[in-house]
Amino acid sequence: NMKQKIYHIIIFLLFWFCGVAYSQNPKADILQQDLSGLFDNLSMIGILGEDCSRIDIHITEVRKMDSREYEIKGISRTRLSVICPFKGKVCVDSISSCSQMIKSEYTELDGFIYGYYSFAEYGDKRYSGTFSGSFKQGYRMSGQQIEKGRNEIAELKLNLSEYRGKWKSAKGLTKVCSWADEIIPDTPANFCLFND
């Protein structure tokens, strides 16, 4: 109904402001905390290459190395059957906060952290390569604790985890690659033709 549509539009605008409103100082303290929990156990789906091959990314282990750097371990799966373990790092370089906190029964988000990543696959040399690019990750405050943002309303089409970049094979072949928890970024306009 109309009320629900207006509610969804308002929520969308609030999320849009999140990405735009950068805070100056109090949020800098957040970056000093251990943010491992924001990355741990993430499962995302994405696309690899011009032909938009499906890729699944699962982060299995996270460890804080220094104030802004985290060691990451996980697995990638392409063609639904080729599984490669990977390890690497994420570096957090900035933070934004929502101009208004979003707290409801289904959605909790205080802002996003941003940075870059580099993950090297190991295992079968024919299939392994290196992922690199930039990311954003939603967070929420729970008392003094920082936790993953939460969204249970699929209609919002809101990514709480989003990675954009490239994959470079051991032989030097480079492919565009992006993945997320909800809506895959950078999909071509005719994406549905690939995936019908």
Question: For each predicted feature, which ranges?
Answer:
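Central antiparallel beta-sheet cores of small beta-barrel/beta-sandwich binding domains
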Residues: 25-196
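Bacterial Sec-dependent N-terminal signal peptides
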Residues: 1-27
